[in-house]
Regions:
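Short acidic-glycine loop/turn motifs at beta-strand connectors
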Residues: 12-14, 94-95, 155-160, 250-252, ...
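Small/polar glycine-rich anion-binding or flexible loop at a beta-alpha turn
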Residues: 372-375, 393-401
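ATP-binding N-lobe of GHMP and related small-molecule kinases
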Residues: 112-207, 220-230, 234, 240, ...
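Short Gly/Ser/Thr- and Asp/Glu-enriched loop/turn motifs at secondary-structure junctions
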Residues: 121, 250, 392-397
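Composition-driven recognition of glycine/serine/threonine/acidic- and proline-rich low-complexity segments
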Residues: 1-112
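Short beta-strand-to-loop capping motifs
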Residues: 11, 23-27, 155-157, 165, ...
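ATP-dependent small-molecule kinase catalytic core of the GHMP/sugar-kinase superfamily
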Residues: 113-119, 127, 133-137, 228-388, ...
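Short, small-residue alpha-helix embedded
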Residues: 209-223, 396-403
Length: 440
């Protein structure tokens, strides 16, 4: 038998990967005390060898440079950012090999080129509040900031502008955002942008806003600029309908926003999604609340469903709006007297009840009515499995459930439903009470 271990070592100040290491240790060659410590995954091998005085010598097996596009360089936190150094060696003790170690080190660690890293949250959009407009305002709503998934973006000095990612679709989206930022006046010097991790696009988790703001804030911060939140939002053109994604990026927590002034000559004069409402300005914040740390969020992301964005999204707004004013009144009551008190008092049952009721009224009901049957089946199954509240985020297809215990049964129920259709994945995450993080 062989002990196998794979680890990433990070710089705690900027979260950049220093080393990706894989080790193999023949169990029969290890002293007993060293073996016990080795089975503790949190204890570094170097400490064990030092304390047990196990190392006699090292034998280098190979040392090579891996080009940035070579598949062998594709290790977590290292993939394609730059060329890498690959080193393999054996640790010898009592004339026997006790460790075989393979290390990959980003070559840019040996350069003096500036690099910063941006980590964004994602968000659940619970629902738009007022898609009637009689009040003189429109939009408004509530949403939850999530710790995972999120974008991890690295921006480095370069001789020419370039974008890399393990997913061509992600790179294309980055390039589209860069074009928009340039068109809106952001000066962008030669940079290398690499996406280490991405939020799935067009699934209801706010990927467009997080990517746009992550790039705008990262590039301006890279150049030493400190722009206001409103200026960065203006550069991206986001937040023209919902203010949840923009507030999630800057503040985190559970967000309630006030929407936009509505009518001739006002911020908005028609019902439309954020993607075509860039001139509406950002929605004022009504309130923000801390998300209880003990609450879990289960995300079910079905595969193979039609993505609703662009023209499809615009058409749905035109078809469904204005919604009856009675629906707006009911949703306002649910928000004010159930959802907000539930989070203030950490009352998961009341909060979950509000989430469940939100699905049956106003624009959210319209969003759900156009979904394939798997979405309603997911919602029902996750509730039956014990989630206190289950809903669809934005236009979906992501379905989310909130619970404190019993997450595993909710995950199993969601996976069973998705496997009966076209498949999908689940994500277990927490609420996030801070916004994006930028480190250099």
């Amino acid at each position: 038998p062989v002990n196998y271990r794979e680890v990433d070592l990070y710089n705690k100040n900027n979260l950049n990967t220093l080393i990706h290491a894989i080790s193999y240790a023949p169990i029969s060659h290890l002293p007993e005390n060293a073996l016990v410590r080795l089975m503790n995954e949190d204890e570094p091998i170097g400490y064990i060898m030092r304390d047990e005085m196990m190392e006699s010598r090292r034998e280098i097996i190979s040392l090579e440079r891996l080009p940035s596009q070579q598949p062998g360089a594709g290790k977590p936190g290292i993939s394609r950012v730059s060329s890498s150094i690959s080193k393999s060696y054996r640790i010898i003790h009592n004339n026997r090999p006790i460790f075989l170690i393979n290390e990959i080190i980003p070559e840019n660690l040996f350069s003096e080129r500036k690099t910063i890293r941006i980590q964004t949250p994602s968000r659940i959009h619970i629902g738009l509040l007022d898609m009637n407009g009689e009040s003189g305002r429109v939009d408004g709503g509530a949403g939850i900031t999530l710790d995972n998934p999120g974008f991890e973006i690295r921006i480095s000095e370069a001789d020419a502008f370039s974008v890399t990612s393990s997913d061509a679709k992600v790179s294309q989206n980055v390039e589209s955002v860069i074009e928009r930022l340039r068109a809106n006046g952001l000066d962008i010097p030669p940079l290398h942008i690499h996406i280490d991790q991405a939020i799935p696009f067009h699934c209801g988790l706010g990927s467009g806003t997080q990517l746009a703001l992550g790039l705008a804030a990262g590039i301006s911060g890279f150049q030493g600029e400190s722009y206001s939140d409103s200026y960065l939002i203006g550069l991206t053109g986001r937040g023209g309908t919902s203010g949840i994604g923009t507030k999630a990026f800057f503040q985190g927590g559970l967000i309630v926003d006030a929407g936009h002034r509505f009518g001739p000559g006002k911020s908005k004069s028609s019902f439309a999604p954020s993607s075509v409402s860039g001139g509406a300005g950002f929605a004022p914040l009504i309130s923000r609340y801390e998300i209880p740390k003990e609450w879990n969020f289960v995300l079910a992301v079905p595969d193979g469903l039609h993505e609703i964005h662009g023209t499809d999204e615009v058409n749905i707004f035109q078809k469904c709006c204005p919604v009856p004013v009675h629906d707006v009144q009911v949703l306002s009551h649910i928000l004010l007297m159930k959802l907000i008190p539930g989070i203030i008092e950490h009352d998961l049952d009341q909060f979950g009840t509000a989430i469940n009721e939100f699905q049956e009224w106003g624009f959210k009901k319209c969003e759900l009515d156009i979904q394939p049957p798997v979405i309603r089946t997911l919602i029902d199954s996750m509730r039956d499995a014990g989630a206190s509240g289950v809903g669809m985020s934005s236009f979906g297809p992501v379905v989310y459930g909130v619970c404190d215990t019993g997450s595993s049964s909710v995950i199993s129920a969601a996976e069973e439903v998705m496997n009966d259709y076209s498949g999908g994945k689940t994500i277990l995450t927490k609420g996030r009470n801070q916004g994006a993080k930028i480190v250099s």
